[in-house]
Amino acid sequence: MIRLFKEKNAFLCTTLSPALPYALFDRSITNATEIEQFNGNVVFEGIIDCAKKAIANDIPVVLGNDVGCPWITQYDFWRELFYIHKYVGVSNAFALYTATARAAEMAGIGAETGTIEPGKSADLIVIAENPLEDLRALRKVEMVVTQGRKNDHPQVKINPVVTAELDQFLVE
């Protein structure tokens, strides 16, 4: 696998969110059978192992989250950063890099966006705490700036059941 990634100059898009519920949730919540939970854990551990091997072999890694899968929300991408930190063991800075500059590079738009610097385009979130210290700070967005317009305290429709279940896995 590593050889093929290097030959093709490919990126690995690590996506832990879809497998986490099937691997780690109580089956009474997911309604998964014992076999489905076993298989979910095989997939989850495989994703973690693949990400670790890619990083150890200098394969570029980015993050995805497969919005549309059960237990995945459009407002929770920050969890994917937390999961790669917690389960793969990367630093908070590396997690942020995979979701910003590295993702822009993979998309072929790294010269235009992905980092905050003169001449580049950027949509920004403003948060009260430093995600380099704790990635969970990303969940409390104070402001969004997009295309030059700011949105103070954006309101997001949150599913409390999904949030409560997923929050159980935010402990380091």
Give residue ranges: language-model regions.
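C-terminal cap of metal-dependent C-N hydrolases
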Residues: 99-101, 118-164
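His/Asp/Glu-enriched, well-ordered alpha-helical/loop segment
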Residues: 32-36, 44-130
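Structured helix-beta-strand junction loops
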Residues: 4-8, 57-58, 138-141
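Short, acidic/turn-prone active-site loops that include or flank metal/cofactor-
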Residues: 16-20, 89, 149-150
